[in-house]
């Protein structure tokens, strides 16, 4: 099956190198997009955006507000549904692509009612006022017409298309991952809900009418017959999302004609082609859980410390951590009944982790033996199928679920609830929709960790690593090197252990596995966010602003980064922060809560007991052993 939209893979593995730079996405509709419509299915297309607020309609456009005509091949006007409706603030714009675009007609006068009526086309579907009633009688269609003039704000025009974005436009390898005719539509922040509902209703009607003229063998129906993704062969809106009115939109299958019209609506920020998200294989081998030990020591590990995790045994209590992944083996003994199933997003999939990746990540966050915060609650949010694949839109829906579940728990104000964290060890090509979803989830209060990716490239080229409000995590090794696969760059915030990490797995209630990747590094940070949240001082302490109940994600992100160990890692590019996370070593955290000036370096000193003193003297031997093991590819 040929697929059409953006690639996503689990952060533990290799994925596609692709960048998409969109200036000022919050006002993406204010940028002009140049797209070669004729060949957009055959090869990636270059999209350019230029600020042009004063652009006037072209000479080829008639001037009559809110009316759209599509020229047929023989020059006749083909009627098209209108999406703006009388509640919209402006009329639609030109959609000229390859000479076949939809043309808006702008009113030249509002005074001559008779002339105006002569100019008005009859619309098929579209809005309530211009609805065409169709009846089938004896195999023939009889069309009734009901037409009312629309009221649009005088003098305002929507002359530019909302951007159509796709990683495949910038990386040919991603074309095979695009899902044909399936799109994620994102509204501008603050778009009125009444107008959104009106727009969606019209889109649904127009899509149903759009497929009436298609033959049963049309390629559109090939994509919509995939019952693992589609709920209707006719297509249309399948699902919607809304995170506290900060990030909203809908998902569905649409013909090209309807996509063109959707992009003309002033409510729409951008349209993104949906795509397949995949997990690839990863190495499994026996190893010790050195990662926990590393984040609890500032100095380099030695034979006396490499397997010692220093922590507060109350860490994690009162915090809920959402694992947005392949699911979680919630019956694993190491979760001690603190793990529950939240939601399965993929259509017709089962409530279990048939892959293992999500269970492994959850174990690093909160399991008894392998977790950073050993008392936290875990919620499984399945966005990838048991075979390790899913869609970008399902990932967006998973983020929405976590955000709403957090808001509900926070509003209930249950005794002992201290906040929510989330981990998403996914990575792939740039997706504005996913980045905005993650940022919106952070804005409503979730402390978010995401994997930097495993392509040894600039993390800013991938999503959700480029979501600026999350904490983006690169992977380090036992020898304090940047892992050879780990992405880098200014979008990386911190590093955490990510090579040969032992954690919980699937197959039984006590299964374990050792995996590698930034997918394994990110849960260390999600666990550490959970750790600090659970141990935060009371709201009446000096650490909080007056009236504040808990640290905001922005505040905790800043403190976590500042408290981390600086300049201790090797092979870190110049534009990449040399920062390794640190949990405080199980000691008093007053320095963490108070610390706003002092930077912590690898020269941190503390009083050593006898065991630690002896261990420190073995550093040289340990380094030599490590070099030998490194050469044998054992570590």
From Swiss-Prot:
Active site per UniProt: 325 (charge relay system), 357 (charge relay system), 519 (charge relay system)
Region forming the signal peptide: 1-19
UniProt keywords, alphabetically: Amyloid, Disulfide bond, Glycoprotein, Hydrolase, Prion, Protease, Serine protease, Signal, Vacuole, Zymogen
Bias-annotated ranges (Basic and acidic residues): 35-50, 74-85, 94-109, 126-136
Keyword Disulfide bond applies: yes
Reactions catalysed according to its record: Hydrolysis of proteins with broad specificity, and of Bz-Arg-OEt > Ac-Tyr-OEt. Does not hydrolyze peptide amides
Glycosylation sites: 594
Key word ATP-binding present: no
Chief place where the protein resides: other
The organism's place on the tree of life at top rank: Eukaryota
A GO term from the CC aspect: fungal-type vacuole lumen
Start and end residues of each stretch annotated as Disordered: 35-155
Subcellular location per the Swiss-Prot or TrEMBL entry: Vacuole
The enzyme's E.C. designation: 3.4.21.48
Induction trigger: Repressed by glucose.
Enzyme class: hydrolase
GO molecular function: serine-type endopeptidase activity
Record's compositionally biased regions (Basic residues): 137-155
InterPro entries listed in its UniProt record: PCSK9_ProteinaseK-like, Peptidase_S8/S53_dom, Peptidase_S8/S53_dom_sf, Peptidase_S8_Asp-AS, Peptidase_S8_His-AS, Peptidase_S8_Ser-AS, Peptidase_S8_subtilisin-like, Peptidase_S8_subtilisin-rel
Note: [beta] is the prion form of PrB. In contrast to other prions, [beta] is not the result of a conformational change of the cellular PrB, but distinguishes itself by autoactivation in trans. Usually, PrB is already involved in its own maturation, but PrA plays a critical role. PrpA mutants lack PrB. However, in growth conditions that favor PRB1 expression, PrB activity persists in PrA mutants due to autocleavage of PrB in trans. This condition is stably transmitted to daughter cells in mitosis. [beta] can be cured by growing in PRB1-repressing conditions. Present with 1600 molecules/cell in log phase SD medium.
Function according to Swiss-Prot or TrEMBL: Vacuolar proteinase B involved in protein degradation in the vacuole. Among other substrates, acts on carboxypeptidase Y (cpY/PRC1) to activate it by processing its Pro-peptide. Required for meiosis and spore formation, and for optimal survival in stationary phase.
Protein name: Cerevisin
Species name: Saccharomyces cerevisiae (strain ATCC 204508 / S288c)
Lineage: Eukaryota, Fungi, Dikarya, Ascomycota, Saccharomycotina
């Amino acid at each position: 099956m040929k697929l059409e939209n953006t690639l996503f893979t689990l952060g533990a593995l290799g994925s596609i190198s692709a960048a998409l730079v969109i200036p000022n996405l919050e006002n993406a509709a204010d940028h002009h997009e140049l797209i070669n419509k004729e060949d957009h299915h055959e090869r990636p297309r270059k999209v350019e955006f230029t600020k042009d607020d004063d652009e006037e309609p072209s000479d080829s456009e008639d001037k009559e507000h809110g009316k759209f005509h599509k020229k047929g091949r023989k020059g006749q006007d083909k009627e098209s549904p209108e999406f703006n409706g009388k509640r919209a603030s402006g009329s639609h714009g030109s959609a000229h692509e390859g000479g076949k675009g939809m043309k808006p007609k702008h009113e030249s006068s509002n005074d001559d009612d008779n002339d105006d009526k002569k100019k008005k086309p009859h619309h098929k579907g579209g809005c309530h006022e211009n609805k065409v009633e169709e009846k089938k009688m004896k195999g023939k269609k009889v069309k009734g017409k009901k037409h009312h003039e629309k009221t649009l704000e005088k003098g305002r025009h929507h002359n530019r298309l909302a951007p159509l974005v796709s990683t495949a436009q910038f990386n040919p390898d991603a074309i095979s991952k695009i899902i044909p005719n399936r799109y994620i539509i994102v509204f501008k922040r603050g778009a009125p809900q009444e107008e959104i509902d009106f727009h969606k209703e019209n889109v649904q009607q127009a899509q149903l009418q759009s497929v009436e003229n298609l033959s049963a063998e049309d390629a559109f129906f090939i994509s919509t017959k995939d019952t693992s993704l589609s709920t209707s062969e006719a297509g249309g809106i399948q699902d919607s999302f809304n995170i506290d009115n900060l990030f909203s939109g809908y998902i569905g299958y649409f013909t090209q004609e309807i996509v063109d019209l959707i992009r003309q609506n002033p409510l729409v920020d951008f349209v993104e082609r949906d795509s397949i998200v995949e997990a690839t294989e990863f190495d499994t081998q026996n190893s010790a859980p050195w990662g926990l030990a590393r984040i609890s020591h500032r100095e380099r590990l030695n034979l006396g410390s490499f397997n010692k995790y220093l922590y507060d045994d109350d860490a994690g209590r009162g915090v809920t951590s959402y694992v947005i992944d392949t699911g979680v083996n919630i019956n694993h003994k190491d979760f001690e009944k603190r793990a529950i199933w939240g939601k399965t997003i993929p259509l017709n999939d089962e409530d279990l982790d048939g892959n293992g990746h999500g269970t492994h990540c959850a174990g690093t966050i909160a399991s008894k033996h392998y977790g950073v915060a050993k008392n936290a609650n875990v919620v499984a949010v399945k966005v990838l199928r048991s075979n390790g694949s899913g869609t970008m839109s399902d990932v967006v829906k998973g983020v929405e679920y976590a955000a709403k579940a957090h808001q509900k728990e926070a509003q209930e104000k249950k005794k002992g609830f201290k906040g929510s964290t989330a981990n998403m060890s996914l990575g792939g090509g740039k997706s504005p929709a996913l980045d905005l979803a993650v940022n919106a989830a952070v804005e409503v209060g979730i402390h978010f960790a995401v994997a930097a990716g495993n392509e040894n490239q600039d993390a800013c080229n991938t999503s959700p690593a480029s979501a600026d409000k999350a904490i983006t995590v690169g992977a380090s090794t036992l020898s304090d090197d940047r892992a050879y696969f780990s992405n880098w760059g200014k979008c990386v915030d911190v590093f955490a252990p990510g090579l040969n990490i032992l954690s919980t797995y699937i197959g039984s209630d006590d299964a374990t596995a050792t995996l590698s990747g930034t997918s394994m590094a990110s849960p260390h940070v999600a666990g550490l966010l959970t750790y600090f949240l659970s141990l935060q001082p009371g709201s009446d302490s000096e650490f909080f602003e007056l009236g504040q109940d808990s640290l905001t994600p922005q505040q905790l992100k800043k403190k976590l980064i500042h408290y981390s160990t600086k300049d201790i890692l090797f092979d870190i590019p110049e534009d990449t922060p040399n920062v390794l996370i640190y949990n405080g070593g199980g000691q008093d955290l007053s320095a963490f809560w108070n610390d706003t000036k002092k930077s912590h370096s690898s020269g941190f000193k503390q009083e050593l007991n006898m065991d630690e003193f002896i261990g420190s003297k073995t550093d040289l031997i340990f380094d030599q052993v490590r070099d030998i093991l490194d050469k044998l590819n054992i570590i």
